[in-house]
A protein has these predicted regions:
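Non-catalytic, conformational "gating/processing" segments within enzyme and secreted inhibitor domains
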Residues: 71, 110-279, 284, 299-382
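Sec-dependent bacterial lipoprotein signal peptides
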Residues: 1-22
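C-terminal, non-catalytic macromolecule-binding modules
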Residues: 291-294, 325
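Soluble periplasmic/extracytoplasmic beta-strand elements of cell-envelope proteins
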Residues: 83-86, 103, 205, 272-274, ...
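Short, surface-exposed, charged loop/turn segments at secondary-structure junctions
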Residues: 286-290
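C-terminal soluble interaction/assembly domains
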Residues: 353-418
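Detector for small/aliphatic-rich hydrophobic stretches
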Residues: 16, 24-169, 174, 401, ...
């Protein structure tokens, strides 16, 4: 059966893992009434753009590995996180900038190259496929009276098409406006990305929002969906609505997994589903995935007659990415070593949180997905006096400081009477 034929459908239980996602809207049709297939980009990619896409993919799988926890589902937008942090990089300097570039996978690329590629990627993804509803938006919100360097604002406006605004963060209307912007950008799917009461030390929010919606090129028949067991990692099962589809689809398999690529609309966007083989856990797959392995998978699909059984699901997910980014080497930005001297003349700035909220709905008709990432910048007050409260077991050393000679060493686990 060819992919252009109407697939027939039936039901059988199967468990699956969603790994890669893109979505679109109601597909336009050509003279024959069919969706017009998109087979090439509107222009060739430059060498730098290819490097940035490769870097973005490396970051995607690095983030997947650091964020993944055994037996826990997750749904992230690496692109949203990358764009929010990419804006923030324009205010960073020195080792802070170097670490951010490395964590995001950009290697030796210059800031000009990175910014230009973000700009072209925005232009490419939005409107690539007329059947795809894709929205990507960026914004920067600063506290009223906080001095922001003009060069930074120019960079985020030009390269990220960012909306820029100065607000009185002490006014409750400020958080309502920021959250309203995110709500609008994600079609109501992401709410309350910043708290109702903005902390007094916050001076800036840098936000990216992404929204996708679309229909499958080959839709599942809702009447064929039945409740079936989904086999959990611990050996138990839960009942889920299992959709079914049979037809020619991009498929590949090896000794570790099966993969099927489900296209949307004009087939420029797709969702890849990876199913571990028996004896291989989904966490094993996560640990083995990197950009090179992904390229091998993505390049290895062949049109094959496939019987697919996929759970219908909807989930919301929220994660603070601080620890994940630190694990990728981005440490200075979060503490007193942070250098954001290209963002403001005020010193003592650091990132207090990188937070992402996401949402996805996969059903018989297609997929809707949204994510928003916020980078929260704070202004550190005067250094706090260190507190040393010796109220638990401790060590002590008596020494002669000038020569370095140690006279006594001791360990106290329960102080004897004085």
């Amino acid at each position: 059966m060819g992919a252009s034929a109407s697939p027939h459908r039936f039901v059988s239980p199967l468990s699956a893992v969603l790994l890669a996602l893109a979505a679109c809207g109601d597909p336009p049709t050509g003279p024959s009434g069919r969706v017009e297939e998109i087979t090439e980009l509107p222009r060739g990619l430059s060498a730098t753009e290819i490097q940035v896409i490769d870097a973005s993919n490396r970051f995607a799988f690095d983030l997947l590995k650091t964020a993944s926890r055994p037996d826990s589902s997750l749904f992230l937008s690496p692109l949203s996180a990358s764009m929010a942090l990419g804006m923030t990089m324009n205010g960073a300097a020195g080792e802070t900038w170097d670490q951010m570039r490395e964590a995001l996978g950009f290697g030796s690329l210059s800031e000009a190259e990175i910014n230009a590629s973000y700009q072209s990627l925005l232009e490419l993804l939005v409107g690539l496929d007329p059947s795809v509803e894709t929205a990507i938006a960026n914004s920067v919100w600063s506290r009223q009276g906080f001095p922001v360097l003009t060069a930074f604002l120019d960079a985020v406006r030009e390269s990220f098409d960012a909306e820029v605004a100065e607000l009185d963060f002490a006014n409750p209307d400020a958080s309502a406006r920021i959250n309203g912007w995110v709500d609008d950008a994600t079609r109501g799917r992401i709410e309350d990305i910043v708290p109702e009461v903005i902390p007094a030390d916050v001076v800036m929010y840098l936000i990216n929002a992404i929204y996708f919606k679309g229909t499958w090129t080959f839709q599942f028949d809702r009447s064929d969906t039945t409740n079936e067991p989904f086999h959990l990692s611990n050996g138990s099962t839960q009942t889920v609505p299992l959709m079914t589809l049979q037809g020619d689809l991009p498929y590949r398999a090896d000794d570790r997994s099966q993969a099927v690529d489900l296209p949307y609309g004009g087939r420029a966007f797709s969702m890849t589903v990876l199913l571990p083989r028996d004896g291989v856990s989904v966490d094993d797959l996560v640990s083995s995935l990197d950009a090179e392995r992904w390229a091998e998978i993505a390049d290895g699909f062949h049109e094959t007659e496939v019987e697919l059984f996929l759970p219908r699901f909807r989930m919301a997910y929220e994660r603070t990415l601080n620890d994940d980014l630190k694990a990728l080497g981005m440490t200075h930005a979060f503490d007193e070593r942070a250098d954001f001297s290209r963002l403001s003349t005020n010193g003592g700035l650091s990132i207090s949180a990188v937070k992402q909220k996401s949402w996805v709905d996969v059903n018989e008709e297609g997929t809707e997905a949204a994510a928003a990432t916020v980078v929260e910048i704070i202004e550190t007050s005067l250094p706090q006096i260190p507190v040393v409260r010796v109220d638990r077991p401790f060590l002590f050393v008596i020494r002669e400081r000038l020569s370095g000679t140690i006279l006594f060493v001791g360990k106290i686990v329960a102080p004897p009477g004085a």
